[in-house]
Amino acid sequence: MYREFEEFVFNNYDFNEPAIKRKYYHSKRVSTISKKIAENLAWPLEDIKLATQIGLLHDIGRFDEWTMYKCFNKYMDHGSYGAYLLNKEEYEKMFNIKSYDKQEVLDTVYYHNKLKLPASLKDNKFCKLIRDADKLDIIYQLSQREIVMENNTHVISKEVFKEFNKGTTITNKHIKTYADKVLSILALVYDINYAYTLELLKNFNYINKIYDNLENKEFYKDYFDKINKYIEKR
């Protein structure tokens, strides 16, 4: 599984590009996290293997996205594109996707980055798990560096404030300022499905590490307190 993924990345993309390297390691970490959560949930071995595989492949659309556009989230929906790639016979063979697992793989990859799952998949355990693992690693990455926005102001947009206080994730197009970005990161926690994912988030102290890296900490204190209380209550 990992060998095929490594060959796919190294043979088709420029690994010297930081964005490609970052997505490669993100994919491997999400795969590891997915396996860990599935094991904690005592899933059958075959389901654990599938969760591990989908975790590795969830961002496969990102590599072409960067190569074509040199940016993320502007011109392409990488979840939809990733599912399109994995639906091709050559990718199915390359990654040894079993025919009876294919629809599960396609659905999970397609919807992993959407604001919410459709009603038909809201209880799908693979979709829920991969979304958890992905968010946990995104929060980890943001805990390791400063948040950078072109509009570096501590002003929260009306739409972002409303969504945050409703307890929902933030719509990407509403994120316009540094403050919006901070709240959008915190709001990822609202969409975490499994208690064990929240336990990992708490144990690794990612939320407080993000707070420690902030500019103008006092402005954000109440929002961080709210999220930490939410984690404790869940």
Name every feature range the model reports, one short phrase each:
Residues 14-18:
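Glycine- and acidic
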Residues 42-53, 92-111, 122-129:
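Acidic/histidine metal-binding catalytic segments
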Residues 48-74, 78-82, 86, 103-115:
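His-Asp-centered metal-binding catalytic motifs of divalent-metal-dependent phosphohydrolases/nucleases
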